[in-house]
Amino acid sequence: MQRPIAARGARLTAAFRHAWRRALAWLLRGAALVAVWEALWVIAWGATSGVVGAQTKAAPFEDTLAQRVQACTTCHGPQGRAGPDAYYPRLAGKPAHYLYKQLMDFRDGRRHYPLMTGLLAPLTDEYLFEIAQHFSALDLPHAPPAVPARRSGATAQQLARGQRLAKEGDASRQLPACTACHGALLTGVAPDVPGLLGLSPDYINAQLGGWRLGLRLGAAPDCMALVAKRLGPDDVAAVSAWLSSQRVLGIEASMKPAPGVAPEVSAILARDHADLACAKARAPGQGAAAAPTEAPTEISSKEPSKMLPLVARGAYLAQAGHCAGCHTPRGAEPYAGGGAIDTPFGKVYASNLTPDTIHGLGNWTRDDFWQALHHGRSKNGRLLSPAFPYTNYTLVSREDSDALFAFFQSLPPKPVPTPAHELRWPFGAQWALRAWRALYFKPGTYEAATNKSAEWNRGAYLVQGLGHCNACHAPRNALGASQGGGALAGGLIPMQNWFAPALTSVHDAGVSRWAIGDIVALLKTGLSPQASVSGPMAEVVRGSTQHLNPADLQAMAVYLKDLPTAPSLATHTVQTAPTAPSASNPQGAKIYKQQCAQCHGEQGLGVARAYPALAGNRAVTLTSTVNLVQTVLHGGFAPATGANPRPFGMPPYQLALSDSDVAAVITHIRGSWGNQASRVTALEVSQNRNQTMR
């Protein structure tokens, strides 16, 4: 009797498998869709915990947006997922404007998550919008409820309370229903209201807590902050338990508002926020707004063609000097200052350069500005902190100083006060600054080298003066002064835990053996056949050098190529007989195959203009491993530039890999494919992990 039953069961199982495969093939018909799905699944679920599950074989490289944004899907996955430090919500199918705003808020510091801020820092508004549209358009199957009701631990009374608040609100406490803004099915309303289903209770609790405490901010009027502050702890627990236990029914119906919003709730919204978008747009029976179709544009004060010639020249010089890098904090008013700059001696705050008469340069003259730039003195004669690089700007000509001042005077005045510096005694005292200047500063002007070409001298003027390259690419002493005069011998950037490699060493970042065109390409786009930029240099390329005209880029390249060769601060060391990496470091080889080979290749050859080669890469074999560890831990994108507007991203592995994992994979890379550099220890990784990246 057992055999016939077993045989029949086998036939039924085979029939079920056949039917399931046919259904799946029909659902995923088309090679392109299958490839995208598999790529998302492998990428997303292959890098989450410790040494992650093995990938089988690297897929062929395809230049798609899905490939470019692997830095996103590696953490978020196709469905959202729990991570070691948080819950990463599903991105697929969310309203495009909502996703775009969140990306902007992370990049500009309005939402606080350092990994996201660092990852998005080099990207433009336009690219963020394109990324948002990409994920919004994905129609992937929804996962089961994050926490089914039967396993949530919530009582029936709690779930009923959560359902009532979500669907009806509480007019007596001026609490609108969640459906009033988030749609009848609570799956979002186009163009900018997210869904609330398919999320974990921890994530929902964290977001409501962020709204309550002011850690998460919205554009005025901030309706979510108002709602969150009216919810008690029991309300939050009930709502999160009920929402997280609900199944998502589909995207198609999600972009519609609730069929009927209670009149008293509409009255609450209208009374508390008369201009609140959700109070107006969620009226009963009203259709959803259309999804966005056009990308935003970066905001600038004026087009250069509409400026007076002197002002236009000043705007160009401000970009050459990357003034916005300090004087325009992320998400703040252009050149209005107020941002903190960390130094080994405390915080200094960038000043307001707009013509505001109280907080800015409104009462300054061009002579006052020249005094600050050339002599390091404020309008009232006070000595300025050398965190403002007047030690470089003293080389700027009076004509260029006047042009810069004309540009800053043309800006709209912004009444943004500059906080007082927070320096440890005695570093902010005037007598201490006088002593420092006596040792390390002498006002001067750029003196052209008579034995060099005009092009070389123009490059030297830009690199040594406005570009203030040695502010990063030179070592500093215990008092913060750059060492070696104008030499660009490399050094650790204070408080940023990035190493600016020597521009005078062919083993570090020297370009004496490069073609001029390749140097120009690196400064213009962040990419060249030999290298790509990352970290602070990515921000310099995005905010400064990509905007320089061809003649100035050529001049800088000529000067940099001609720099005298000198020993690097991080002396390049070589192992004469490295052990075979796969035999001596199986852990590193395994992690590389699982996490890195898909993009960088089994032999470390990379993909041109997408993923840098690791074989023979000087950044890999530097004795200072700071940058390499930072890159593995924090990931990142190359800078988005006019010539490379959609750069490829690398996912952060700070949460996915332990210190020993990171040390093992970096050691493998530094000892493979002809690379011969020292091992990296877990202690080195741990020390870098605990430092501030940006």
Task: Name these PLM-found stretches.
Residues 1-60, 104, 108-111, 248-313, ...:
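N-terminal export/targeting leaders of redox proteins
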Residues 56-81, 149-187, 307-328, 333-342, ...:
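Sequence/structural segment immediately N-terminal to covalent heme-attachment motifs in c-type
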